[in-house]
Structure formats: C-alpha cells, structure tokens
C-alpha cells in the first residue's frame, strides 16, 4: 500500500509517532476548548456581523472561541505558526502550521441550529498532518492522524477499503 499524503508530510516534517500523538492531543484539547466556549454563547449571541461577502458571518462566539484556541495553541506549541479564520496568519507559514476555524457553521449557530463545529488541523507546507473536529452540541469529537487512526470520541472509525469512488 502506498504511503499516505499525511504520513509522507509527517515524515518530511521530522515528526515521530510520539510527536504526532502529542500534537493530536493538543488539537483535541484546542477543539474541545473552542467547542465549550461556543456552547456558552449558544442561543445568547450579542453580536452578528457580515464579514464582507454576503452570508459570510462572524459572531462574538467565533471571536471568543478563537481567542481561547489561539491562547492554548500558543502555550502548548509556541513554535508552530497559526492560520486562523478570524484573525489571519501568524508565524512562519512554510513549516508546521495550525489551521483554525473556531466556528465552522456560523450561519447554523446564529440561527440556533445545532449543527456547527470547531475545526483544528495541522499542516506541513500545504499537506495535512492531523485534525480534530469538536461537534459540541452532539458531544462528539472526530480526530485522526497517520499511524494513529481516525476516531469519533474514542471509538475507531471504519473506513472503506475501496480506493476508487466508482468502485464503492
């Protein structure tokens, strides 16, 4: 079986399996902290603004969750750059980089629909390495990394062995 894009990126970044385990733990903690902050604001928004494009919203919950996530990432991984949806990029952008969407599904959130998430990913260059997605209303955390697997909470996800869509 050929090496996955994520596995190759992890190798090129010089990350050991224990590094990946630690970083996926950081991603999970950050996603969980962001999701908890979103739930504190759910149904109690004090600010909803249009970011410029029609239908592209930002709320006080987006901003509050992003602040908490960025603080946690800076404390636990100060040498890793960040690209965050609301505040933009910080740090060297060609190595390891956290990609943060503090409120994925802002429109749903703003309308009181419970289908929203906090998404945290780690990339090396343009290649994905690992990710964690907290769906706080459903109390679910999806996460995964090469060599570790993909999970919902702590239950392994089963993926198809089919490699081509037309064969599925």
State each model region's role.
Residues 87, 104-105, 138, 155:
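Short beta-turn/strand-loop junction motif enriched in small, turn-promoting residues
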Residues 44, 116, 144-148:
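A short, compositionally biased
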Residues 45, 54-55, 79, 113, ...:
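Generic secondary-structure boundary/loop-capping signal
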Residues 1-103:
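N-terminal subdomain of lithium-sensitive/metallo-dependent phosphomonoesterases centered on the IMPase/IPPase/PAP
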Residues 94-136:
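Glycine-rich active-site/cofactor-binding loop and its immediate structural neighborhood
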Residues 3-6, 11-15, 121-168:
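Acidic beta-strand-loop-alpha-helix segment within the catalytic core
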Residues 47-50, 59-60, 84, 92, ...:
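Generic structural "secondary-structure junction" signal
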